[in-house]
């Protein structure tokens, strides 16, 4: 009887125990946003906040192309525990929308987080950038590129392409520099010197070819140099120079001029004068020349690519009794007694330092100007070759000097020395008006040429070699007078100190003497010829 009672009590106990036991709930969790989405992968995860009353067995992610994915779909799992976790979803298809949920399991139940959707990246051509161009030479350069993304497909070809057009393609010049993504270097060859090229990196996958941004560069070349005109002509020297207008892309290590009596001189075949480095203008002196000789000169400039030359300039050194002005007008000279004179009238448009003398053709401006000025007789350039130019008083007294270096405007006293050397009576030297007719002083100074002088050109013998010509003059009243009849030349001596009245000399076609201006001289507003006297 007691045994039956005990069994009954045990059964009741078990019945009570089982009737009191509660089934566990599913775990509680959330799904993280999807990040780092690529062509075939993405990152997500979850956060298990409640185990549902039973230990977490596993947790992970499930995903599908259909909504509300379950553990029966694609999953990734890891050991279960409370807390946050992250997983990488793999094996995805590009350009596809997926639905993903975090899940966790306990002993009896599966819990799911909220659903999150995302779309994988669509496959594309690669992404490529062009590297800077370096090691530029005359026929080659280096570049390359970087492929940060293959577009989801293997890169099967990469390199750079180049041309003179702004958007070169692989159909033109190109390099082939391997496969795959990452960085690469490329050597560009077969280029033409001094040419601007455009280069682009390229990368190709099964979808096509993409290009980086075009980068331009210019290949190196010899410098570009011009030759200056020749100036400062003398019997054994001259001045030239040039300008390096482009370095060719490389440092100019030498520049100057080279010259020879043969055409197209070089730094190897001729004589050279080196004048510095770099770009810009330069001046070169040529010395040791032979008088009365034809020379050829070229400017040169050298960089690492080579030596370039400017155009050839031809010049002649002066004969023994010649001098040149700053404009390269050449004058013959003559010794008369103790003096050396020009045999021609001055033609220069510049002072001896190179500054311009104004060409003034307005009568009012000529009268009012306080600066040096010149003009042709009758403002007609046809008179220049035979008669030279007419200058005002301000020009002949300017400190910059109208005569070439080593020469000057003769003073009244120096004109008297010339006249005395030709036999003028000493008493006449101080007289004004025409003097020295008895000694034919004027005739000895006049050129014997009735095409230049009006007949009879009285007394003309030119036995001195002075070769005076009648270039006429410009009057204070604004008129030109005396072409072919009167030659009028300035002296540097004021007729009255501290005034604008100056002495001058005149030869006339009908008089054998030479005229010295009256004591009141000539108002400085006149325009006369100039003969230069050696210092």
Place the predicted regions along the sequence by residue:
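Compositionally biased, low-complexity segments enriched in small residues
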Residues: 1-5, 73, 93, 192, ...
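Bacterial Sec-dependent N-terminal signal peptides
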Residues: 1-27, 318
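Short secondary-structure boundary micro-motifs
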Residues: 2, 20, 102, 201, ...
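Alpha-helical interaction segments
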Residues: 10, 88-89, 188, 285-286, ...
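Short, surface-exposed linear motifs at loops/turns and structural transition points
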Residues: 20-319
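Conserved positions within compact, well-structured domain cores
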Residues: 319-535
